[in-house]
Each structure stands twice: as structure tokens, then as C-alpha cells.
Amino acid sequence: YNTPSVEIAPSTKCIKSAKISLYYSIAFLEKLSMTQEEKYMKAAIREAKKAYALEEVPIGCVIVQNDRIIARGYNRRNTEGNTLAHAELTAIKKASKKTGDWRLEDCTMYVTLEPCQMCAGAIVQSRMKKVVIGSMNPKAGCAGSVLNLLQMAQFNHQVEIERGVLEEECSTMLSGFFRELRDKKKSLRENTQNA
């Protein structure tokens, strides 16, 4: 006795629903496999993208206390016309305001690019516990590249450092930004010469 088989074509709605479920399942699995450091560095990268959108050097930063982001910052130096408008300084100021204390001893900073001397000094002064860095800065970095101000024995506070978290993603964003900037300048020069 044979039962006739009937093929039922899935509806468009059913396919869309399956695709959405698959998308969220993949996103959930990616989050599960992500370390805490990667999770918070992703948040810093989102801040850096805000700077990128303003045509600023894409540097982003978050400060975490008790497994919660308490402050965020991104580079706005050109936008504000202010040398002090670095991502790290913005985040430190916000974190101090949020905690009601300039001492951020139980906080960790996640930053997409190795801090400069000014920001490294502020990190030490704020008594930050740890700094997690995405990409190193061989020209101006002061967490080991040019100097290591964060761990100088002569200072009354040293900061724990973790380097290279999502380094490729952070580096790619920075190199892409500078490539676009060079291309714009080249195009502008060529247009000026042809005018």
C-alpha cells in the first residue's frame, strides 16, 4: 500500500521567518563565543565609528565598572577644535561624573588605539585598574610602543595592560580611514590642478 507524497512549497513568510531565526541564532552564538574583552572592545569600536562618521580619526573608548559600561567616548578633536577632545579623556570625565569620584580604581578602559602621552597620563592620574588596547600606535603610543607611561615604576600608580584585543578590526578601521583621507587629498589636488 503506497501513500501518495505531496510536496508543499514553503511560503515566503515562512522562509523570511526562518532566515530571521537563523540570523538571531548566529548572532547569539557569536555573543556566546565572544570574550568579555571582545564584547567591550566591540562597544569601543562602535564609539570609534561615531568619530569616523564625523571624519575624525576613528578612536573609541568605553570604561567598565562591575561588568557594566559606565562611560563612553570617541575622538572629537577636529569637530570641537580642542586638543583635549580625545576619546579617553572624554570617557574618563564621564566616568568620574558618574561615580562621583576622580579615582577610577575599580574600572577598566577599553580603547581601540593605544593611548597617547596625554591620555596615558590621565589614565595613571585617574588610578585606572586596567587598560585593554585594540591596536598599537608605533608613532605616539604610550602604553609600550614609544613609551610605557602606564607602567613606569617611578609613578605612584601602575596600570595593568592587555594588548591586541580585536586588533585586526581596530587596525583595519584606522588604515581605511587614513587611506580615504589620502585619496580625498589626492583627488582635491588633481581637481585643483585641472581647474
Protein language model regions, located:
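Zinc-dependent deaminase
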Residues: 24, 28-54, 102, 118-195
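A short, polar/charged loop-to-alpha-helix boundary motif
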Residues: 79-89
